[in-house]
Amino acid sequence: MSAKPEVSLVREASRQIVAGGSAGLVEICLMHPLDVVKTRFQIQRCATDPNSYKSLVDSFRMIFQMEGLFGFYKGILPPILAETPKRAVKFFTFEQYKKLLGYVSLSPALTFAIAGLGSGLTEAIVVNPFEVVKVGLQANRNTFAEQPSTVGYARQIIKKEGWGLQGLNKGLTATLGRHGVFNMVYFGFYYNVKNMIPVNKDPILEFWRKFGIGLLSGTIASVINIPFDVAKSRIQGPQPVPGEIKYRTCFKTMATVYQEEGILALYKGLLPKIMRLGPGGAVMLLVYEYTYSWLQENW
């Protein structure tokens, strides 16, 4: 008698994991070029540097001319390897935290936001080593063929700096802030607004209703969390002076960037980030919901 609920729980968890992994894989394959551009903007420090990008269009032009088409896909292997477990963790833990918070008398709005925060913090711990490798590869301006392999670069980091907070897990506090804040806003906004706007009986209009809310969710979350993202890129990317660590901790890095470069420097890469995580956030939620719905009906 007790076997059925257990199988049901395992199957439910499996659906959430498969749907979340599928959402992540689709999103990264579509949107990675914008992530490369965003990272390049965030790690450049001086507008007078001849290698700096003047605008979004200029960055696309220079990367294509100097590094070729594959330059836009630098560092894609770490997120591909990480996206399935990362997004699976994102959506699965969100659902689990939401269930746990159901035992506490919280408003639905607060429940969605806190569950999102919890899922973001959990996701950050899983993904941070992959992010360290990805940012390092994206910062490399050599041609795709000349840059080190993903595994080779990860080995370099481990050999020189180890596994800890100065090595493969550097920037963990900034990653926790980035993912925690993003997911809190992303899930909190999406599910609260979705519940306010009536469901449309026309499947095409219903698709666009969800896409529009997802787009807004990803955009707003990106604007709010980007200072953490800039700090993360500075900590995990190449330091200004080789052999000297300038950027160590999240809030100290934010303060340094603000003091030396001004408030706008904390929003570097905002446009490519919005272009990626606005539609990308909508794609993830839609792929998750439609895949999960299909799995419910067929498995």
UniProtKB/Swiss-Prot annotation:
Going by the UniProt record, its keywords in alphabetical order are: Antiport, Disease variant, Lipid transport, Membrane, Mitochondrion, Mitochondrion inner membrane, Primary mitochondrial disease, Repeat, Transmembrane, Transmembrane helix, Transport
Q: Which domain of life is it from?
A: Eukaryota
Provide GO CC annotations from the record. Answer: mitochondrial inner membrane; mitochondrion
Main subcellular location: mitochondrion
Q: What is a biological process (GO) this protein takes part in?
A: lipid transport
**Subcellular compartments:** Mitochondrion inner membrane
Q: Which sequence ranges form a coiled-coil region, renumbered to this chain?
A: none
Q: Name one GO molecular function term.
A: antiporter activity
- List, alphabetically, the Pfam families matched: Mito_carr
Looking up InterPro entries in the UniProt record yields:
Mit_carrier, Mito_2-oxodicarb_carrier, Mitochondrial_sb/sol_carrier, Mt_carrier_dom_sf
Q: Which reaction does it catalyse?
A: 2-oxoadipate(in) + 2-oxoglutarate(out) = 2-oxoadipate(out) + 2-oxoglutarate(in); hexanedioate(in) + 2-oxoglutarate(out) = hexanedioate(out) + 2-oxoglutarate(in); L-2-aminoadipate(in) + 2-oxoglutarate(out) = L-2-aminoadipate(out) + 2-oxoglutarate(in); glutarate(in) + 2-oxoglutarate(out) = glutarate(out) + 2-oxoglutarate(in)
Work out whether the entry's keyword set contains Transmembrane. Answer: yes
What the entry lists under Gene3D superfamilies is as follows: Mitochondrial carrier domain
Q: State the disease link.
A: Mitochondrial DNA depletion syndrome 18: An autosomal recessive mitochondrial disorder characterized by early-onset progressive weakness and atrophy of the distal limb muscles, loss of ambulation, and atrophy of the intrinsic hand muscles with clawed hands. Additional features include scoliosis, hypo- or hyperreflexia, and decreased pulmonary vital capacity. Examination of skeletal muscle shows mitochondrial respiratory chain deficiencies involving complexes I and IV, associated with mtDNA depletion.
Question: What PANTHER family does this protein's entry cite?
Answer: MITOCHONDRIAL 2-OXODICARBOXYLATE CARRIER
Family listed:
Belongs to the mitochondrial carrier (TC 2.A.29) family.
Q: What is this protein called?
A: Mitochondrial 2-oxodicarboxylate carrier
